[in-house]
UniProtKB/Swiss-Prot annotation:
This is Succinate--CoA ligase [ADP-forming] subunit beta. Mg(2+) binds at residues 200, 214. Its EC number is 6.2.1.5. GO terms for biological process: succinyl-CoA metabolic process; tricarboxylic acid cycle. GO terms for molecular function: ATP binding; magnesium ion binding; succinate-CoA ligase (ADP-forming) activity; succinate-CoA ligase (GDP-forming) activity. NCBIfam families: PRK00696.1, sucCoAbeta. Binds 1 Mg(2+) ion per subunit.
Length: 390
């Protein structure tokens, strides 16, 4: 789950991590009141969306008076911001962060992720702040400093100092501030079950202070059951509507760009199914794992989600019955076809627990459902059917 910048900074404040004074607003008049509360005569207006690249897309603006402020907020609210990280529709702008300006002398990058290889939290720092860290990693990986955290003892102050001096910094007052910031970020990361934390940029002001100018936080979805405060921060308007619908039925769904819908039980089999579709000349429209405890109702809802994608021209159902019974899957398929009125080809491959019974139910249903003879045949059949439609 992703947080907005204003939500991320709210958390940073709780951990005594310095951020600029700011207020989130939902209408132009509130922006003027927010500016008066913040003080000063110049402010930064930031569109709140779950995507990077806002500045280049016009979503971050410097305003020099309250008339400009009100105009900028009015121009952004209610629009959809398209950046290099969004699709062509962009993300809806429903909130604006009004923030005090900062006297920036230097920009740095600071971040933390869970490294899958070492199975530990890794903190990263770079002198290349204010730009996409992915580009830095690609072009100049040597400019990214890393420290790996031992979970038995946690982040140690000497590791913070390693990063500090590695950035070419020397001032002792800044070293103490930097150490406090990194230690606070580590506590935030571990206590709130984060999967990603980025401060980009971490700025050094003209007076030598360190301030977190922007913040990005991702939370581990599997930990939301014990993070009630963070769970309430979820903004479903920023998420794909199909994925939101799938979460309500405990379905693992990820939308892709192809035109062949996939419904599979098991993440590994789902990925293999998508691979085989590609090898057969097709393009999968989604990843959808109904899980090992699929019910008739969940299968029906899975079909609804798949066909709600207007790009889908055919559906491949690939089920290996272990825990899940193939006859239950067949019941769900029949129910979905009747309820939703599916008018695209459906190819089904059933193997394992009650596969013969499931195949018989599909055959006796009288519906135009194509039974596949095997895994490879299923992929070839659906690619062929979609090709005929195209």
């Amino acid at each position: 789950m992703n947080l907005h910048e204003y939500q991320s900074k709210h958390l940073l404040k709780k951990y005594n991590i310095p951020v600029p004074a700011s207020e989130v607003v939902f209408n132009p008049d509130a922006a003027v009141d927010a500016a008066a509360k913040i003080g000063g005569d110049r402010w930064v207006v930031k569109a709140q969306v779950h995507a990077g690249g806002r500045g280049k897309a016009g979503g971050v603006r410097l305003v020099k008076n309250k008339e400009e402020l009100k105009s900028a907020v009015k121009a952004l609210l209610g629009t959809r911001l398209v950046t290099y990280q969004t699709d062509e529709r962009g993300q809806p702008v429903n909130q604006i962060l009004v923030e005090q300006t900062s006297d920036i002398a230097r920009e740095l990058y600071l971040g933390a992720v869970i490294d899958r290889a070492s199975q530990r939290i890794v903190f990263m720092a770079s002198t290349e702040g204010g730009v996409e860290i992915e580009k830095v990693a690609e072009k100049s990986p040597e400019k990214i400093l890393k420290v790996t955290i031992d979970p038995a003892i946690g982040l140690q102050p000497f590791q913070c100092r390693q990063l500090f001096f590695g950035l070419g910094l020397q001032d002792l007052k800044q070293m103490r501030s930097f150490t406090d910031i990194v230690m606070g970020l580590y506590r935030l990361f571990t206590e709130r079950d984060l999967s990603l934390l980025e401060i980009n940029p971490l700025v050094i002001t003209g007076s030598g202070e360190l301030i977190c100018l922007d913040a990005k936080i991702n939370i581990d979805d599997s930990a939301l059951y014990r993070q009630s405060e963070l769970r309430e921060m979820r903004d479903t308007t920023q998420e794909d509507e199909h994925e939101t619908m799938a979460q309500q039925w405990e379905l693992n769904y990820i939308k892709l760009d192809g035109n062949i819908g996939c419904m599979v039980n098991g993440a590994g089999l789902a990925m293999a199914t998508m691979d085989l579709i590609k090898l057969s000349g097709g393009d999968p429209a989604n990843f959808l794992d109904v899980g090992g405890s699929a019910t008739k109702e969940r299968v029906t809802e899975a079909f609804k989600i798949i066909v709600s994608d207007k790009n889908v021209k055919g559906i491949l159902v690939n089920i290996f019955g272990g825990i899940v019974r193939c006859d239950l899957i067949a019941d769900g398929i029949i129910s979905a076809v009747k309820e939703v009125g599916i008018d695209v080809p459906v190819v089904v491959r059933l193997e394992g627990n009650n596969a013969q019974l499931g195949a018989k139910k599909l055959a006796d249903s009288g519906m135009n459902i194509i039974a596949a003879k095997g895994f490879a045949d299923a992929a070839e059949q659906i690619v062929k059917q979609v090709g005929v439609i195209a």
